[in-house]
Amino acid sequence: KRLRWHQTNPRKLGKNKIFFFYRPSDRKTGLLTLNIKIPKNFKSTLKTKNINLCRVNIGGFNAKTKCLENIPADIEIDSETKKVEIYPFSPLPSNKESYAVVFKVSNPQKSGLYQFHTFGKSSGAIPVASYLGSWTVRIDQL
């Protein structure tokens, strides 16, 4: 499933802020954990202090995309399997709010398309991990 995303700078080697959105239509249930699989060829340094989870206002033609409030969460990066695991202190509810994982990164040297996959563990009597969708981020040549 194709998910929405937004970035501030598409140029290669540029400082970038990438918003990976979790809209209400993307979440059927509340989410206990979020896993983001980073593509192998996305060569950029990720640090836990540069990743956060927040309630977000998705911008458009006349509004800016920005975080409204940060959601406290434990963030772990597994550099071998190239996965980011996010454990919010309280589960993300399945309400009408939009949430986003925000990466503050330097773009990789190679331009092209990078596909990030996300998995979520649903909150309920029996937590079930399931595939939520993918974001295809484009890095430009210029």
PLM regions and their residue ranges:
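Solvent-exposed beta-hairpin/edge-strand motifs
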Residues: N35-L68
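Solvent-exposed coil/turn segments that connect beta secondary-structure elements
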Residues: P39-N41, E80, F89-P91, K104-S106
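Serine/threonine-rich, low-complexity linker/repeat segments that form flexible spacers/stalks
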Residues: K1-R27, N35-K37, D140-L142
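Extracytoplasmic
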Residues: K15, T29-T33, T48, T81, ...
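Helix-rich interaction surfaces within compact, conserved domain-sized segments
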Residues: G30, V105-L142
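Low-complexity, intrinsically disordered segments enriched in Ser/Thr together with acidic residues
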Residues: L92-K110
